[in-house]
Amino acid sequence: MTDTSSSQPAKAWSGRFSEPVSDLVKRYTASVSFDQRMAQQDIRGSLAHAKMLARQGIIGATDLADIERGMVQIRGEIERGEFAWNLDDEDVHLNIEKRLTALVGNPGKRLHTGRSRNDQVATDIRLWLRDAIDRILALIGEFQKNLLDVAEANAATPMPGFTHLQVAQPVTFGHHLMAYFEMSRRDAERFTDCRKRVNRLPLGAAALAGTSYPIDREFVARELGFDEVCHNSLDAVSDRDFAIEFCAASALLMTHLSRLSEELILWMSPRVGFIDLADRFCTGSSIMPQKKNPDVPELVRGKTGRVNGSLIALLTLMKGQPLAYNKDNQEDKEPLFDTADTVIDTLRIYADMITGIRVKADAMRDALKQGYATATDLADYLVKKGLPFRDAHEAVALAVRAAEAKGCDLPDFSLDELRAFSPLVGEDVFAVLTVEGSLASRAHVGGTAPEQVRAAITRARGKNA
């Protein structure tokens, strides 16, 4: 069935056209259903623009006063949920402008002087994204604080370190968690760096070529807290690289949290049993009464794919566009909004979930006995006695094979049995083969010795203060 055009009010741009837009096209092209969440940023940008227009003598002081009065009322209506969003008015910008004009008359019609929706929306997005980044950085800090608390409580709690999911060498649980702290530190650095490029003002670029009005872009930048203006009008309205950069930083952060989630899931499994997770982060089964499922970490893994998808969506959106603005760019907002929402929700729940970890230290220690975790320490011991490393490696490999055949761990061998693999072995070898001895020997910066883990936590807290 062919869609027909219904009677509708004139568009802000309708003078050029001989027939109204069809209902189908109207629905297909409207963005107000999702870009209305930038309403407060749109009002902030419009107020700064109006103040600049009045300062430059482009509109009168009474016009500015009327615009400010109208915007106060509109802001209140939006905050109270009373604002009537209208699909006929396409987007957040025209909805607010139309309401302003209804409230104050001609001053509302003068607001758009020297401005296009192209630079207006670019400004709104940057203001919105700047606010989102600030919230994300605060949440990363909260997550880090709680992570450091758990790491400090377990700075000396031994557990297996793994490679290829095989027991490799002893580490401490605190040291393991500090690896994720370092990842989150880099995540915060990326968002902080991204914010610098977000914080540039596009307003004044107008549609694409600038404007003939004597505007003062630097004044608007100061009013809105931007560090500087965008230096090329075409670039200002047509690129969304700052949004792509934000999504890339988000994808990396979510990837790090996804890896931690995978470990929490494994550690919580009865087959591993290293931790338990507070009940408030788990769910049960509708059929199996014994189940306690780690749904939150599993959803973090799943939502990481969602954020990765948004990054690819934005890259694909931009890759074939000629300069300057194209309607394609309307599709930037939903992936961007969804990414920010997902990251914020994930960080909020993760900051709490970290505090809900209950460590099963005995299970961690028992696991160290199953994989010959101190074999490398024995090899290093022989090297320090003068044996070349490759020869020491071979001697210890033979000892491990013998231990497997006997069904014991290396510290369970007698001194004579160990000497059968190398005459360099002395009575001091048993101190080397203990878990505590292995941990204590990694006493350099970045090592897993408990005092080094505590020092790393102290440094981290100092930088986070």
UniProtKB/Swiss-Prot annotation:
- Which PROSITE patterns has this protein been placed in? FUMARATE_LYASES (PS00163)
Listed GO biological process terms: arginine biosynthetic process via ornithine; L-arginine biosynthetic process
**Catalytic activity reported:** 2-(N(omega)-L-arginino)succinate = fumarate + L-arginine
Q: Which UniProt keywords apply?
A: Amino-acid biosynthesis, Arginine biosynthesis, Cytoplasm, Lyase
A GO molecular function assigned to this protein is: argininosuccinate lyase activity
Tell me the compartments it is located in: Cytoplasm
Which GO CC terms are listed, alphabetically? cytosol
Q: Which InterPro entries match?
A: Arg_succ_lyase_C, Argininosuccinate_lyase, Fumarase/histidase_N, Fumarate_lyase_CS, Fumarate_lyase_fam, Fumarate_lyase_N, L-Aspartase-like
Q: Does the keyword Lipid biosynthesis apply?
A: no
State the pathway, as annotated in the record: Amino-acid biosynthesis; L-arginine biosynthesis; L-arginine from L-ornithine and carbamoyl phosphate: step 3/3
Give the matching Pfam families: ASL_C2, Lyase_1
So what EC number does this one have?
A: 4.3.2.1
Which family is it part of?
Belongs to the lyase 1 family. Argininosuccinate lyase subfamily.
This protein is called what? Argininosuccinate lyase
What organism does the UniProt record list as the source? Aromatoleum aromaticum (strain DSM 19018 / LMG 30748 / EbN1) (Azoarcus sp. (strain EbN1))
**Taxon lineage:** Bacteria, Pseudomonadati, Pseudomonadota, Betaproteobacteria, Rhodocyclales
